[in-house]
Amino acid sequence: MMDLNLSPAPAADADLIKDTTEATFMADVVEASQTVPIIVDFWAPWCGPCKTLGPMLEDAVRAAKGAVKMVKINVDEAQQIAGQLQIQSIPTVYAFFKGQPVDGF
């Protein structure tokens, strides 16, 4: 039987959650946050709490179905951005909207 469910397809993970670098941070976070809030997860591979928090954030972003997106940034590979945003411990999470950080923990 043909499925006639005409609701839009859910956004793919690649549209909702992505890794970024110093080279793509402006486009992935600042520019993208003009239209939808962006959750930025600052993490490192050696960080135990990051391994717990990251998947929880990803699940929440998927559940929001496109109302918010997530960008992950490895602070070991993006030390300049981490310094500019004064990231002093990880995991650190910021919410960007309209090009600006609006909240964080």
Region annotations inferred by a language model:
Residues 1-66, 79-80, 90-92, 96-105:
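Proteins that catalyze or organize thiol-disulfide redox chemistry
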Residues 75-77:
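Conserved SAM/SAH-binding loop
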